[in-house]
């Protein structure tokens, strides 16, 4: 059986659309209708005509698609594909923080559970967080769950006071300054490109900081030939497609999000064939979470 052709056949029969994040395995990226970062994919999910969305990513992404389009069937091929950082933020903890800071606006990274989104004023991604914070009148901001993205945006918006949740991405947090300095010393003229989920000490020695889509755009438009890429290595698939003459180096030779790498072509095929692993969200909860995502699209540009 040619599983790729079978997937395309099932997709056509069912009128489905396949979305994939940049961190997915190359085979999934290649068969997807759209590949992108969280913000781009959330817009596609909201605006697409198809009534069946197969989201090759992690759970919070598929949940966001369902929140935005409750009338559509949203399928996550591997239900176990979660996000460690998203799990670090709890609704109970956020409710307590809101009581302690009643005048603060709550901005949650899209890498959050539906329950956290429901208690937040606005959602954001790494590509639109600065715009959103600047568009808020309030000076006090509760930002969760990523302390690294939060501190990065805090540097960009010094007129705001941030209360940061103590969460982080285990993949980006693991990178040490010494490894980046080693790579720099071994490759003269190399540019360092980092995701804002990296720690401040990594951001401070980087030449460019941006979301996955911003990293790809920066590298594609750069005349430089060598890059240290400090984000999940799935982005290398797109970078190599667009810059065959360029050299890319990943810290320690490996930056892997195991949850993002769970989804295989077989999983995608099985989910389309059986129409299983549908995302279901309580309507009252969905409506509360919807406001934060609606405000993201309104304020994020």
Curated annotation (Swiss-Prot):
Q: Which reaction does it catalyse?
A: iminosuccinate + dihydroxyacetone phosphate = quinolinate + phosphate + 2 H2O + H(+)
Q: Name one GO cellular component term.
A: cytosol
Which cofactors?
[4Fe-4S] cluster
Under the heading Pfam families, the entry gives: NadA
- Keyword Glycoprotein in the entry? The reply is no
Q: What is its EC number?
A: 2.5.1.72
Instruction: Cite the entry's keywords alphabetically.
Output: 4Fe-4S, Cytoplasm, Iron, Iron-sulfur, Metal-binding, Pyridine nucleotide biosynthesis, Transferase
Which GO biological-process labels does this protein carry? 'de novo' NAD biosynthetic process from L-aspartate
Per UniProt, the cofactor note for this protein states:
Binds 1 [4Fe-4S] cluster per subunit.
Q: Which residues bind iminosuccinate?
A: 21, 38, 109-111, 126, 195-197, 212
Q: What is this protein called?
A: Quinolinate synthase
EC top class, in one word?
transferase
- GO MF annotation terms: 4 iron, 4 sulfur cluster binding; metal ion binding; quinolinate synthetase A activity
Q: Where in the cell is it found?
A: Cytoplasm
Q: In which pathway does it act?
A: Cofactor biosynthesis; NAD(+) biosynthesis; quinolinate from iminoaspartate: step 1/1
Record HAMAP family:
NadA_type2
Q: What does this protein do?
A: Catalyzes the condensation of iminoaspartate with dihydroxyacetone phosphate to form quinolinate.
Identify its protein family. Answer: Belongs to the quinolinate synthase family. Type 2 subfamily.
Q: Binding of [4Fe-4S] cluster: at which residues?
A: 83, 169, 257
